[in-house]
């Protein structure tokens, strides 16, 4: 701080400053990049650096997954993924695949689709009716039964099969996408 006190940032701007604030090496890297390319429109054209990064990302993905689509945020990523899922099924002649499945207490951003598949009750209530055709898997956190578990928990098989329950309920041929956080961030960390 200005008066010499040290403060621990326990929020870290929703995890976007996990390396700390104003780290000289990071500030210098950002400044150097901004001098070379501060913005490259992604529509029907790009910058060689964007293609280079896309190739590096694709090389990390499993075989056959070689397409990269850059977004500005997790919210935009979720919204784009949902649209890609719907468009994919329509292109395959499976236009009935419109149902989206999220998880209770899941957080998938601030956009309309992300809030719809997200399972944060307060967020969903604040906006009233959202996207139709969305259902949610039960959340796996059970504080009473998850206290300091070591190894495989003694419960949870019913949660592992929850997607099968929803498939039976809705008909799997109507499901376009399932989106879950492998580790709950906003509601579980």
Regions found by a protein language model. Name each.
Residues 1-5:
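Residue-level recognition of short loop/turn positions
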Residues 13, 74, 106, 183-185:
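Short glycine-rich anion-binding loops that position phosphate/pyrophosphate groups of nucleotides
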Residues 36, 142-143, 184:
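Active-site/binding-pocket entry motifs
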Residues 44-45, 150, 154, 188:
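Alpha-helix capping and helix-loop boundary segments enriched in small/acidic/polar residues
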Residues 56-177:
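PLP-dependent aspartate aminotransferase-fold enzymes
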Residues 179-189:
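Conserved PLP phosphate-binding loop immediately N-terminal to the Schiff-base lysine helix
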């Amino acid at each position: 701080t200005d008066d010499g006190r040290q403060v621990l940032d326990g929020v870290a701007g929703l995890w976007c400053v996990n390396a700390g604030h104003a780290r000289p090496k990071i500030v210098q890297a950002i400044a150097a990049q901004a001098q070379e390319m501060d913005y490259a429109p992604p529509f029907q054209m790009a910058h060689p650096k964007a293609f280079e990064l896309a190739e590096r990302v694709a090389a990390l993905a499993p075989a056959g997954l070689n397409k990269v689509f850059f977004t500005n945020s997790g919210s935009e990523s979720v919204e784009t993924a949902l649209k890609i899922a719907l468009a994919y099924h329509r292109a395959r002649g499976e236009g009935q695949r419109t149902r989206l499945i999220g998880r209770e207490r899941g957080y998938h951003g601030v956009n309309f689709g992300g809030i719809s598949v997200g399972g944060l009750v307060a967020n969903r209530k604040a906006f009233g009716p959202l996207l139709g055709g969305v259902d949610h898997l039960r959340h796996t956190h059970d504080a009473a039964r998850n206290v300091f578990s070591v190894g495989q928990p003694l419960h949870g098989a019913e949660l592992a099969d929850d997607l099968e329950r929803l498939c039976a309920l809705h008909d799997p041929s109507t499901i376009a996408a399932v989106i879950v956080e492998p580790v709950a961030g906003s509601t579980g960390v």
